[in-house]
A protein has these predicted regions:
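Flexible coil/turn residues that form the inter-helical turn or adjacent wing/linker of helix-turn-helix
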Residues: 1
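FAD-dinucleotide binding site
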Residues: 4-508
């Protein structure tokens, strides 16, 4: 199927909103390509655009029937909530610049979120806990001054108090190799019990599956990125739970009480997926969707990519933005050197499953509680989305099931998983019974093109594997958020695109 650029833009919107089409491509005449880019997420698209701007002929292959990768907006759910790629902050300079280049408006949510400080409810063992009484609660496992910490703030406090080095920007430096241990070992060395770790780290985990499979250096990297953005997202915590709300770009003015001057909690107008869609529309070369890559062959002077339909795409070089969780299922010939091969096959990824619910009526007004919740059960985190016409309008609720909870919920399948979520809501919040509909659900773990959400370094992997992640393999080059070293998330994806573009331009 061949479309011109105007038709491509229109079709991209249709695909994102209806997912009714199976293939999309706008093709140039068949000629020798300079570069094939695998993946139409932020890193792949930015790499392709940069290489085209430098005169190279590029083709982008994407396995899904949409662009964006893990930047995924639900255009058919009120408010267009995000499944992945949630917000940007002041330190997301590359994202802001990419939006400016592509004509995508950045909206600052800080005034709205700080003006709606409803907090969140705390449910433990199926019972609501008054956060004001948590310090003396019989199920509080923490000790000493840490008993004052709510579960979603405990691990942050432990890391801030006990991290053994302060130059967090050098988290990957070999001099810190002795700290490439599990978070579990680190916390127990500082007096934490398994009960503390289970509640304060493993529940609604942000990195990994449990504290056993996350490196302390991974936490240092995450803490560094938090430190960079702390002035932008004051209430961000490792779990994603809020002690207060969140925010967006043009920087916030101090017109709303409690909003720090200059605060940005940014989203892209109409849904964050609008950014990769606009970037894709700027491409000059081919963008082929529904192209599942099964093999990559590389030599010192050329490379080729084979897709599941049997087609072989040839070019002088290949840029691969696939997460290692899916790249490990692709035949690479010749094999990468042993350390890189091991990284491809063992790098960790966090399990995350989301349910997006729409309320028929605002049941939280009936029970007098906040719609947001932090639970130790199947609901995990419940985050209200405020993308309506009014600042106080809640357009949907997002249920975040992370780590072991995400794996547990996935075992039910989609339909039974929906019923599990609705029944758990009704159990904890009786006023919600019959008032909620599951508008969408997505498991990043069972998604064949992601097999997990963001990358996680396991204990020992920073020391052994990190330096090999993005090492060029003949004419095969690597990018993606998992290869970034100075930033994370959407900004990390664009950081990796800068690096890989320079590598390719230097080699050709």
């Amino acid at each position: 199927m061949s479309l011109n650029r105007r038709q491509f833009v229109a079709s991209s919107v249709a695909l994102a909103t209806t997912a009714s089409a199976s293939r999309l491509a706008y093709t140039a005449t068949d000629k020798e390509l300079d570069v094939i880019v695998i993946g139409a997420g932020l890193s792949g698209l930015e790499s392709a655009l940069t290489l085209e701007e430098n005169g190279l002929r590029v083709r982008v292959l994407e396995g899904r029937n949409r662009v964006g990768g893990r930047v995924y907006s639900l255009f058919d759910v009120p408010g267009n909530p995000e499944v992945g790629g949630n917000t940007i902050a002041n330190a997301y300079g590359r994202c802001i610049a990419a939006a400016n280049r592509s004509g995508v408006e950045v909206v600052n949510l800080a005034p709205r979120l700080f003006g709606s400080r409803l907090g969140q409810e705390f449910f433990l063992g199926g019972e609501r806990v008054d956060t004001r009484a948590w310090e003396t609660h019989p199920r509080n496992p923490f000790q000493g001054e840490m008993r004052q910490k709510l579960p979603w703030t405990w691990s942050d406090a432990m890391f801030q108090k006990h991290l053994p080095f302060t130059d967090l920007e050098n988290w990957h430096d070999p001099k810190h190799a002795k700290h490439d241990i599990s978070v579990h070992d680190f916390l127990t060395a500082h007096g934490a019990t398994n009960e503390m770790i289970d509640l304060g780290f493993n529940t609604n985990i942000a990195y990994g599956t449990t504290a056993y499979d996350v490196s302390l250096l991974q936490q240092a990297f995450s803490d560094y990125w938090q430190k960079v953005n702390r002035g932008a997202i004051m209430a961000f915590s490792r779990t994603g739970a809020s002690n207060a709300p969140a925010g967006n770009t043009p920087v916030a003015q101090a017109t709303t009480p409690g909003v720090p001057p200059g605060l940005l909690v940014g989203v892209f107008k109409g849904g964050n997926q609008r950014l990769p869609m606009a970037m894709a529309a700027r491409l000059k070369g081919d963008l082929l969707l529904n192209q599942t890559v099964v093999a990559i062959d590389t030599t010192p002077g050329s490379a080729s990519v084979t897709t599941a339909d049997g087609r072989v795409h040839r070019a002088k070089a290949v840029v691969c933005s696939m997460p290692f969780s899916t790249l490990r299922n692709v035949a690479i010939t010749p094999l990468p050197e042993p350390t890189q091969h091991k990284a491809i096959h063992t790098l960790g990824y966090i399990p995350i499953t989301q349910f997006h619910l729409v309320a028929k009526r605002p049941f939280w007004e009936n029970d007098g509680l906040s719609p947001g919740m932090w639970t130790d059960g199947p609901l995990g985190l419940v985050l209200p989305q405020r993308f309506g016409a009014r600042d106080d309008e809640i357009t949907s609720l997002t249920v975040w099931c992370r780590g072991l909870n995400g794996l547990y919920v996935d075992r039910f399948g989609v339909e039974a998983g929906k019923q599990l979520v609705l029944s758990e809501f009704a159990r904890l919040r009786p006023a919600s019974k019959g008032q909620l509909e599951v508008a969408a659900t997505h498991s990043w773990t069972t998604d064949p093109f992601s097999a997990g959400d963001w990358a996680i370094f396991k204990p020992g992997q920073v020391t052994e594997l990190r330096a090999a992640l993005a090492k060029p393999h003949q004419r095969l080059f690597f990018c993606g958020e998992h290869t970034s070293v100075g930033s994370r998330g959407m900004e990390g994806a664009l950081e990796s695109a800068e690096r890989v573009s320079l590598e390719v331009l230097t080699s050709l």
